[in-house]
Design a protein with these regions (language model features):
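Specific transmembrane alpha-helix
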Residues: 290-295, 315
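Membrane-interfacial, low-structure loops and terminal tails that flank and connect transmembrane helices
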Residues: 229-235
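Acidic, glycine-enriched active-site microenvironments
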Residues: 310
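Single conserved hydrophobic/aromatic residue that forms the stacking wall/gate
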Residues: 313-324
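Short, Lys/Arg-enriched N-terminal segments with co-localized hydrophobic residues
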Residues: 1-13
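N-terminal secretory/membrane targeting signals
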Residues: 14-38
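Metal/cofactor- and membrane transport-associated sequence elements
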Residues: 38-226, 237-251, 255-285, 289, ...
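Compositionally biased regions
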Residues: 6-8, 119, 318
């Protein structure tokens, strides 16, 4: 006669119930699969997934503010680091307030084919029919607005005082960028003319670049950067304050671009949408890597540079590759 073994009995019982669980799970997912094949995703589910795409992509783009701060701080002289950090924190704060106060409705309150929206604060008018929440759209568009001003910050590094910079940040993020952005994304006259901009190559980067160019022309070259004769040949590059900090900024920006471009799909509620987002991620990574290789090749052809000098040329190149 076999002696009673509690462990053996317990093992038999566990195997028995595990079998029931696995069988039930298989039956459940079998019927669920049949139901999925026969039905489409509801509008509410699409609304949720689209909203999450906006929010998560916005988080990544917001992180680019840290990337710009690190990249600029690492490449300027040590005496300018604190000013660079203050300007980047300030511009992001100003962008958030101004885009809420007036910017969003200047962009999205434009009549069809028109030129300018309304001078009113943002308000939540979310509806299931839009496909995503208004709040998530506001957040996603706001971080784009801040990025536009970050372009200006890098160009005018070490040549503008903080308070004039903050004043211009309020004007750009509250009025200039929202109005020009609304001409296409807000259904304005550029949209009516057939112009298309998927992820801001014109509306964000050309607008920020034009503002930065205007500022550079007004302010002139930074002291000691070019020869006294006014020639275009640059003098020896400044000693960067921290190459590791600049490198960290490069990778933060690289990461943020996945949200910038991937979120511009504006939808993730269908198989086609999520597949498109994955393709955008791949293209973004290839563009950034290609930009680095191109910049490294060109800088090597120009001069036999030291490693840190080569980095001065290649550090912005992932951004340049993605933008192009």
């Amino acid at each position: 006669e076999t002696a009673y073994n509690p462990s053996l009995t317990k093992g038999v019982i566990m195997k028995k119930y595990l079998g029931y669980f696995l069988a039930g799970t298989a039956i459940y997912f079998g019927f669920a699969g049949l139901g999925y094949a026969e039905t489409t995703v509801s509008a509410e589910v699409q609304y949720i997934f689209n909203t999450l795409l906006f929010l998560m992509s916005g988080f990544l783009v917001m992180w680019m503010a840290a990337g710009f701060a690190m990249l600029e701080s690492g490449l300027v002289t040590s005496k300018s680091v604190s000013a660079i950090c203050a300007k980047n924190i300030g511009l992001y704060s100003i962008a958030g307030v101004m885009f809420w106060l007036v910017g969003y409705n200047l962009a999205y309150g434009i009549p069809e084919g028109g030129y300018i929206g309304s001078f009113t604060p943002w308000s939540d008018n979310s509806a299931l029919e839009t496909g995503y929440s208004d709040g998530s759209d506001w957040f996603f568009q706001m971080v784009f607005c801040a990025t536009t001003m970050s372009i200006v910050s890098g160009t005018l590094a070490e040549r503008i005082k903080i308070w004039p910079f903050f004043l211009f940040a309020a004007i750009l993020t509250g009025f200039i960028y929202p109005i020009s952005m609304g001409w296409q994304w807000g259904g304005g006259w550029l949209s009516a003319a057939g112009f298309s901009d998927f992820a801001g190559s014109t509306l964000v980067h050309a607008a920020g670049g034009a503002a930065a160019l205007a500022g550079a022309i007004v302010l002139g070259a930074r002291t000691g950067r070019f020869s006294s004769s006014g020639g275009v040949k640059a003098m020896t590059p400044f000693a960067a304050s921290s190459i590791p900090l600049a490198t960290l900024g490069v990778f933060i920006l690289w990461l943020g671009w996945f949200g910038f471009n991937g979120g511009s799909q504006l939808a993730s509620g269908t198989l086609e949408d999520v597949s498109s987002v994955a393709t955008i991620y791949i293209n973004t990574n290839l563009a950034a890597g290609g930009g680095v290789l191109a910049a490294a090749t060109v800088s090597s052809l120009e001069t036999v540079a030291a490693a840190n000098t080569c980095l001065l040329y290649t550090s912005p190149s992932p951004r340049d590759g993605v933008q192009s």
